[in-house]
Amino acid sequence: MGERMDKRIRFYIYWILGFVLLGACAPGDKEDVYTEMRAFEDFSHINGDSVAIVPRKVRLKAFQKMEEAKDSLVKYNYLAMTLKTYLITSQLDSAQIVIQQIHDFIERQHSSSQMADLESECFNMKGNIFARVGNMDSAEICFRKAYELRMRGTRIEVVPDILMNLADANNRLGKLDIGAAWYRRALLMCDSLHIASTKKPPIYYGLAQVYVTMRDFEQCDYYYNLAGESYDSMLPYEKYIYLNNSCLLYTSRAH
């Protein structure tokens, strides 16, 4: 049954991509492209938090928007958004198919800031896949590449998320000092970009984890308490991570 379902999913992905490739031959005029890209950015902003809650619903919406879009770059941006949904539903094979299709598209295009954004999204998702299967060396390389590409792009407001992934990869490799440095850079990026404070709690409890491992409980408490101040505004999965980390922190302190 599971194998049959995987085949259906792959067939649907290739069917959708067929429409994408047909539409990729003739991009619209600049005004249309600008309007469509703004529509994508609005879609991403509105549905971003829902990916972790209703991933399949967001995926279906993204596929529908992708079919409606005329410009090929916009189509592939919608396709890239489905990558997060496959990660949430643990359909890593499907995610890898989509990543390869996006990479193939990028290789046929001229370099630009928008292409850097799209390629950064792919490398970030590749890093997440490597992290999911425990290949942290490859994950760290992908996250670093995603960060470098995003800094050449236009949507740098997502850089703190990539830096958190990079910090976590270094922590899991045992490079705690480097992990802490990436977390601190993420905080600096949040401040310099005037990003909402709701982005900061995951960085705070990431730093708390680093310091409890280093047995620096004063710094651990400081960052963990900062994270706790935003508990009411956390998403359900963020609350789970926060509370789970709370148990781990107190267990570590007891030993």
Language-model region placement:
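Flexible helix-coil transition and linker loops at the boundaries of alpha-helical arrays
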Residues: Q64-L73, F105-A116, R150-I156, C190-S197, ...
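N-terminal leader/linker segments that initiate helical-solenoid repeat arrays
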Residues: C25-Y78
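Conserved small/polar residues in nucleotide/adenosyl-binding loops
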Residues: Y250-H255
